[in-house]
């Protein structure tokens, strides 16, 4: 089955990201406020109204702080809409891209012709208690000193360095390119340009992971609106079509007992998405890659087939800026714009839409026609990212 060109993004909305609430006495906003704000911006961008969403699709990314199963229903109440179809982006940071595929298929089925996909979080304003949930983390990781994602990614990063000779200089080129693009993006939270030496000198978090390797937690809300090709006519902005989509969860490369932690599900999901879209690597104008860590961006470039595994020369000679041969993270990514929990993945979708509309301003990729976007979620026990989604977006169907 193909969903190529069966749905398009017609509106985008993102609130500014902030860290209000991290200090006593600071003004705070709730997740509900960020949700309503992001929806209003997306509706305005599309030229639609609230009533256009009633009886239509609503997709909600599930923040890690809200384990309750009825969060999407609560979001519908918060927004004041009555969906005809409700989907949960429950794959962590992959949720925003997963919803692109799910809503495209649903729109193609004829059940709906418009969908709002939205997420928000306010980790610095809202604090939730709770113990460690049963599962691999409690049983197999924490007892041995692995405390959260920084520790896990440190092992992946160290393994790549050991196996392929990867250095901080190779990784730093990605960090510098992302920050350069952030310096051109008024919506970015971190905008001061950095050098590779700045990256190398940033403090250790979990050896060899450094501070400038890590995503920036933040408050904020993000949304996009999708529609059928017929419904896109006479709307405010040109439609950006979903040309291809692929997803893999619980991927395993090699024996289950010794899976290769340096390969992610984007290796398969990317191939499926690109084949559906009918594109090759040279056709893609830019990449918006899920960036909870710099090494994760590095791995995706390899796994998507832009270079061979361990090809250090590719990273030494490739310019990843908007002026180079393979622009990545053209808005700065989550590392520089901030990650409001799982809604952070929507940042990449929104930036891709801006680029394909030609709205990138100083950071516009010249002649951008096709972009590739990824979403990743869950760092499971025994292998790399557990949920991987890839979408190919284009200015034509």
Language model features by range: what are they?
Residues 260-267, 271-294, 303, 334-341:
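Extended C-terminal subregions enriched in glycine
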Residues 50-60, 85-91, 115-120, 170-176, ...:
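Beta-strand segments within the central parallel beta-sheet cores of soluble alpha/beta enzyme folds
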Residues 63-73, 255-258, 291-314, 340, ...:
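Short glycine/threonine-rich loop-to-helix capping motif typified by GTGT followed
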């Amino acid at each position: 089955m193909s969903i190529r060109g069966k749905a398009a993004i017609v509106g985008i909305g993102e609130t500014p990201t902030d860290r209000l609430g991290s200090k006593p006495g600071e003004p705070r906003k709730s997740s509900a406020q960020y949700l309503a704000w992001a929806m209003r911006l997306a509706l305005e961008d599309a030229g639609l109204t609230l009533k256009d969403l009633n009886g239509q699709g609503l997709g909600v990314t599930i923040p890690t702080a809200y384990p309750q199963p009825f969060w999407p229903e609560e979001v519908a109440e918060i927004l004041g809409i009555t969906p005809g179809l409700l989907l949960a982006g429950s794959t962590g940071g992959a949720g925003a891209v997963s919803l692109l595929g799910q809503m495209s298929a649903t729109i193609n089925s004829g059940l709906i012709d418009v969908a709002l996909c939205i997420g928000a979080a306010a980790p610095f304003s809202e604090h939730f208690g709770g113990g460690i949930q049963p599962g691999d983390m409690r049983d197999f990781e924490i007892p041995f000193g692995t405390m959260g994602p920084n520790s896990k990614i440190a092992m992946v990063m160290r393994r790549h360095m050991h196996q392929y000779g990867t250095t901080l200089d190779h990784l730093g080129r990605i960090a510098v390119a992302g920050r350069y693009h952030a310096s051109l993006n008024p919506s970015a939270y971190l905008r001061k340009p950095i050098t590779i030496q700045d990256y190398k000198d940033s403090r250790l978090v979990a050896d060899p992971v450094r501070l400038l390797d890590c995503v920036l937690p933040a408050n904020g809300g993000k949304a996009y609106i999708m529609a059928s090709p017929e419904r896109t006519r006479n709307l405010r902005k040109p439609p950006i079509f979903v040309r291809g989509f692929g997803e893999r969860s619980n991927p395993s490369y090699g024996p289950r007992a010794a899976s290769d932690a340096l390969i992610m599900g984007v290796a398969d999901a990317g191939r499926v998405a690109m084949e559906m879209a009918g594109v090759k690597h040279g056709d893609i104008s830019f990449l918006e890659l899920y960036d909870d860590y710099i090494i994760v961006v590095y791995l995706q470039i390899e796994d998507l087939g832009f270079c061979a595994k361990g090809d250090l020369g590719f990273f030494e000679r490739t310019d990843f800026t908007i002026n180079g041969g393979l622009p990545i993270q053209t808005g700065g990514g989550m590392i520089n714009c901030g990650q409001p929990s799982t809604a952070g993945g929507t940042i990449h979708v929104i930036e891709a839409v801006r680029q394909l509309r030609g709205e990138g301003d100083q950071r516009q990729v010249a002649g951008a026609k096709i972009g590739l976007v990824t979403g990743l979620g869950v760092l499971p026990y025994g292998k790399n990212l557990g949920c991987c989604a890839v979408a190919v977006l284009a200015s034509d169907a």
